Amino acid sequence: MHTVLITGAGRGIGLATTRAFLGAGWRVLALDRDFSSFDAKAPGGQGALEQIRFDLTNTAGIAALSGSLGEVNTLVNNAGVLYCDPYEAIPEAHKREILAVNLEAPVALISALAPQMVARAQGRIVNIGSVAAFTGHPDLWYGITKAGILNLTKSWAAQLGRHGVLVNAVAPGPTHTDMYEQLPQSRKDMVSRSVYSGRAARPAEVAEAILWLGTASPEYVNGTTLDCNNGSYPR
């Protein structure tokens, strides 16, 4: 049975991705710091689930954690933090948390798990970016970190591609998650006007794209960002 590590698995896109991999028969290592709303039932799936409670702001502890996981075939760097702070009044603690969870933790996880993937000449890494990487996003540090995620996707693909490891990203548009629900109604109305279907994505729709890149996409799809934004940023 293949194993996937999914960060931010407790809710939203991470929870939907957990269900998708379980439904495909995978062993899922679901990592989050809060499982209070976690329900990962996947009808008909033959997968296995293990919960890992870990705070990704503890970037210094990631190497030891990764060493305890055993073989990981696919890594999904999904965990993310967003605060709706005005740019002129961003608390330093919020900035540090966003940088740690959204950018530093994915780098640390890839650094820790890539050697075993290289040794097997097989592995897949899927980083979750955002349409915020391409736009002038009102949540300043969130946009910065998501742009960084897409850059590091290409950088790691260039380093690992010759060793049989695929590194790709998914850049979702507005998606019905806890983060989305934090937005003011004016932002939600803007979202409805910006997408072709007039609605935010369902987490399960984004999870389907992640599952494909994490399990079945062609080997020549590498260093690529898959847009999943329904026209909110056509390019």
Give each language-model segment a name.
Residues 130:
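Residue(s) in the substrate-gating loop at a strand-loop-helix junction
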